[in-house]
A protein has these predicted regions:
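Positively charged, small/polar-rich N-terminal and surface patches that mediate targeting and assembly
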Residues: 1-100
Length: 100
């Protein structure tokens, strides 16, 4: 099995829809084994000089999201290629996983 992780900004749009909602609907329609969307609570990127954490006085300018999904390797690669035809942003990584 292969797991894919898609890292995007929460407020990023695909046409008029939130990108993470579009991706989740896309994965559901593609009948992947399972997918989950997570909202980031802390993080940093290449240009940051400190950790970013939202609180009462501060919120992320671009809150991070991670969508992860798992399926057979061929299916994951096919779905990623189809997704990349729809949007070029974000970061997509994959890793082999073992189901227990």
């Amino acid at each position: 099995m292969l797991q894919a992780q898609i890292l995007i900004d929460k407020d990023e749009l695909h046409n008029e829809k939130k990108l993470y909602e579009y991706i989740m609907e896309f994965l559901f329609a593609a009948k992947v084994e399972g997918a989950t969307a997570f909202e980031g609570v802390s993080g940093f990127g290449p240009g940051d000089r400190k950790m970013q954490r939202p609180n009462r006085l501060f919120s992320f300018d671009e809150p991070p999201m991670m969508i992860t999904f798992v399926d057979k390797e061929e299916k994951v690669k096919k779905v990623i290629k189809e997704l990349r035809n729809e949007f070029k942003g974000g970061l997509i990584i994959t890793q082999p996983v073992e189901e227990w």
